[in-house]
Amino acid sequence: MYVRVNAYILEGTNHLNPIASNSVKLNVKPYYIELKDAVPTMWYLVGNMFGAKWANDKNIGVDALPMFLKPNFSYDKKTGAGEIEYTNYFLTGDYNDKAECDGAGFKILPSDFNWDYSMNAILNNEISAKKGTIENRNGGADGGHIVASEAGYYTITINTADNTAKMEKYEGNVTNYGTIQIATSLDDFASDTPMLPYNTEGVENHAWYYVMEVPAGQTVSFKFKIAGSWDTNWGYGAADGAINMYGKCEANGHNIGLAEGKYVISFNDITGAFSIVKL
């Protein structure tokens, strides 16, 4: 490719004293960048409802638990914005004079763990908050702990495009499995490994998580199941080993694949949703 520079003095519409440089030959090497969809935006549950873990170390899967990507939701390919959710049993309790609630209180943090933009309960005044409410702090004054209006099953939904949130009662049927296991191809599905519960306050739990590290150069498959039996198990995908980062599991579905890396895998035994966050 050849290029040159043309210059002139502009006077009104006239081009005065035009001059052109010598031509210069350039060798151009095409450069290809594969465009990838943005990773969906995630928020993290912290607080007394979740073992009094407040993300002090900003350690996902340890002191901050991911919400769930929504099955069949089309996330914005450029920004990753969309809806995320979390369904489980929630305790309730009374606020202290700091709008905090022991045992049942919690907050929700954005992926950068910036408390100035956390999800909190709406304050009535400096010492009390409105149960069952959620709003984004949006850089303003701190809000209260989020607390269910009464004990029971709820779904929390966050729209990460406009950072709005709601907490609604869940009215569907619920089966209590007690524990949920994960089985993997690392030992040819021979053993069960207990997943960890989101709820740690001695109440029913239906959301589970497990931190998995897939060795370099390998792909691992896994399924969710009840303890000691394959009579009840869940999988997902078009074929065994297909890699999917979220979806709604099917009974006796396909093995879910994961490429090398470290992940937090979450599963909800009420909704069947699974969601994976790469660390």
Locations of the language-model features?
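Insoluble glucan recognition modules
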Residues: M1-L279
